[in-house]
Amino acid sequence: MNSFANFSFEYGASDQITPLVKRLIAKNPGPFTYTGTGTFIVGTKELAVIDPGPIDDDHLKAIIETSGKNKISHIIVTHTHNDHSPLSKPLQEITGAPIYSYFNEAMNTKTNNQFEEGYDNSFIPDVIVKDGDLIKGFDWTLEAIHTPGHTSNHMCYALLEEKILFSGDHVMGWSTTVIVPPDGDMDEYLKSLKKLLERNDNIYLPTHGTQIDNPHDLVNKYIEHRINREEQIIQAIKSGNFKINEMVKIIYSDVDPGLHPAASMSTLAHLNRMVKNNIIKVDGKGLKADYSII
């Protein structure tokens, strides 16, 4: 699944992606962020900043410099991981722009993500966005699409004037996303992928990775990848590997062992879905449970 082409960029410098969209990449590369967080600036007069990124003074300065004399009127967040939302507040202090995001207060009570970049549990938006809402600026319109799975509060945003989807971490341009229970939900993730197949967006711009020019092809590949993974899990259980750590050693044998803890959480997400759909049964809870075929 990691067959994406590299793309050229320079930290601190913006790239004009389309007439209405510029991208800046924060200098926070890593195993879950690829080259770093891509911040998108939408519009020509009134600007929307999508996913400001992590706390980073240099990145904040680059956003302000890229906006020039134009007003930043909206700050928009796809979801509240620490590589996406924390810079919203410092940016708001400078610009006065309201912060827009889906908000689920209960999410903060069920997050347990020691992987990826962690949760921004202090985040509260000024404007709560719901599925189907339209956010409008001078020369742009963003449609909000609720896409839970990676997180329960994940939103994608469609730029209607250019048929572009800002896909956040739901569909990334370098790898499949990580699903970490309890807030991450594999069943919801697959439903959200299928939801995107009902749309006609021409291009996806993910927060991590390169532009996606054939989005439906990639979404179908991601769905196929997850279904194949569940078949691998079934075969592992049939071979006598009843615990998650045993399954991971077999299924992810070609992956750096240092990433096996994250792979264990992804496997747990698959198992939760398979239990829910009466494919397998579970005895116990979490990573120490035993699983068997029904």
Locate the predicted segments by residue.
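Conserved beta-strand hairpin/beta-sheet module of binuclear metal-dependent hydrolase folds
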Residues: 7, 11-70, 156-168, 173
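Active-site HxH/HxHxD metal-binding segment of metal-dependent hydrolases
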Residues: 35, 54-139, 163
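Histidine-centered divalent metal-coordination motifs
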Residues: 78-84, 150, 208, 270
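Residue-level signal for inorganic ion chemistry
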Residues: 20, 63, 208, 233, ...
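C-terminal regulatory/interaction regions
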Residues: 2-3, 235-294
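Residues at the C-termini of beta-strands that transition into short coil/loop
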Residues: 25-27, 103, 148, 208
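Metallo-beta-lactamase
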Residues: 47-49, 54-56, 116-124, 134, ...
